[in-house]
Regions:
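Alpha/beta-hydrolase superfamily serine-hydrolase fold, recognizing
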Residues: 1-171
Length: 171
């Protein structure tokens, strides 16, 4: 897109797409041909940041999040990794070097199993000097943003996501 004349790009993704979005943000932020200026920022919603599935909320939120179970995710992770290590930074953004990333926001539900992964990822990025912020939506489970118009947290999350991207594009 940048080669076609677009001067500002944003990257967003939800769930596994959040994992891919964070990986792409890392790649674009460190790309010498983009010189860092083309990437306006990014948003990851309920991202899978740790494919080792070692975050504490897998245990503490498992019963509260019926849409995203450990058994279900374990099978998907194994298929995605295809024999590669779960802690490979190319697959698990939590284990990557995060210094120099473009500004991003992470939105996650307070009742989802990926809560601790999101917290750890944003804390690590912030410690590396990245403009990274976490928004935790009370009572929301995995995939809550797809319920826009039905859940207040979904409406608020989409609004905040849009605010951040508008702010980044105005610069």
């Amino acid at each position: 897109m940048y080669e076609r004349g677009y001067s500002r790009l944003a990257v967003t993704g939800d769930s596994a797409g959040g994992n891919l979005a964070l990986g792409l943000i890392k790649h674009l932020s460190q790309s010498s041909e983009l010189a860092g200026s083309a990437l306006a920022g990014g948003v990851a919603v309920s991202p899978v940041t740790d494919l080792t599935l070692s975050g504490e909320s897998w245990a503490t939120r498992g019963d509260a999040d019926p849409l995203f179970t450990r058994a279900q995710v374990t099978d998907l992770v194994q298929a995605y990794l295809a024999g590669h290590a779960a802690d490979d930074p190319a697959a698990s953004p939590l284990f990557a070097e995060l210094k120099g990333l473009a500004a991003f926001r992470v939105h996650v539900g307070s009742d989802e199993v990926l809560l601790s992964d999101s917290i750890r990822f944003v804390e690590k990025a912030f410690a590396a000097g990245v403009d990274a912020r976490l928004e935790v939506w009370e009572g929301m489970i995995h995939g809550f943003l797809v319920s826009v118009g039905r859940l207040e947290g979904s409406n608020g999350g989409l609004h905040r996501l849009g605010e951040f991207l508008r702010e980044r594009f105005v610069r």
